[in-house]
Amino acid sequence: MARYKESACRLCRREGLKLFLKGDRCYGEKCAFERRGYAPGEHGQLRRKQPSDYGVQLREKQKLKRMYGLLEKQFRGYFEKADKKKGITGTNLLLYLERRLDNMVYRLGFANSRNEARQLVRHNHFLVNGRKVNIPSFLVNIGDFIEVTEEGRKNNKIIEAMETIVRRGIPQWLELEQENFKGKVKMLPTREELTMPIQEQLVVELYSK
């Protein structure tokens, strides 16, 4: 599947906030956004123009897409599912994104970023309820167990990521047995538990035009 080829740090600077696309580096002094928080490009340090309502909605969609590393077709597919589902469309959208296997691998601390988690999933390093799953978009459910394979437990990226768990923390809706390389989805998060700086209602308004 096609992916963004632009520098992850440039994406953060363009959106004006940290998207945590480069894992542990985003928490340290080497983070490019900390050193150059203005937009990329020749005129990046100039004052930004006041965006239109459409521009604000578009930027919010771009932030959310890039945070989860999705392209437009797949992202819109999640929105359409969320819109058909009972409940608040924006919250439904966030929950679909959170239920992705690559996101859960990242949330459990088995990878330093969602992009890294996606690669590790594709390389057959994870089991869901005892069965190998190599599809990053696989949707997990409450009660599912996510476990690193025996081979995966020797992978340096997974080992290094798990060493930073204390700094990042594990969400309350997940349970981690660190010594067993195993996690469980205890529940799905409430909107209040998702602390991302996203106004998902703006995304709903954009797609509802």
Swiss-Prot record:
GO terms for molecular function: rRNA binding; structural constituent of ribosome. Keywords: Ribonucleoprotein, Ribosomal protein, RNA-binding, rRNA-binding. InterPro entries: Ribosomal_uS4, Ribosomal_uS4_bac-type, Ribosomal_uS4_CS, Ribosomal_uS4_N, S4_RNA-bd, S4_RNA-bd_sf. Pfam families: Ribosomal_S4, S4. GO terms for cellular component: small ribosomal subunit. It comes from the Bacteria. Residues 99-162 form the S4 RNA-binding domain. PROSITE patterns: RIBOSOMAL_S4 (PS00632), S4 (PS50889). Disulfide bonds: none annotated. One of its GO terms (biological process) is ribosomal small subunit biogenesis. One of the primary rRNA binding proteins, it binds directly to 16S rRNA where it nucleates assembly of the body of the 30S subunit. With S5 and S12 plays an important role in translational accuracy. Belongs to the universal ribosomal protein uS4 family. NCBIfam families: PRK05327.1, rpsD_bact. Part of the 30S ribosomal subunit. Contacts protein S5. The interaction surface between S4 and S5 is involved in control of translational fidelity. This is Small ribosomal subunit protein uS4. It comes from Syntrophus aciditrophicus (strain SB). The lineage of its organism: Bacteria, Pseudomonadati, Thermodesulfobacteriota, Syntrophia, Syntrophales.
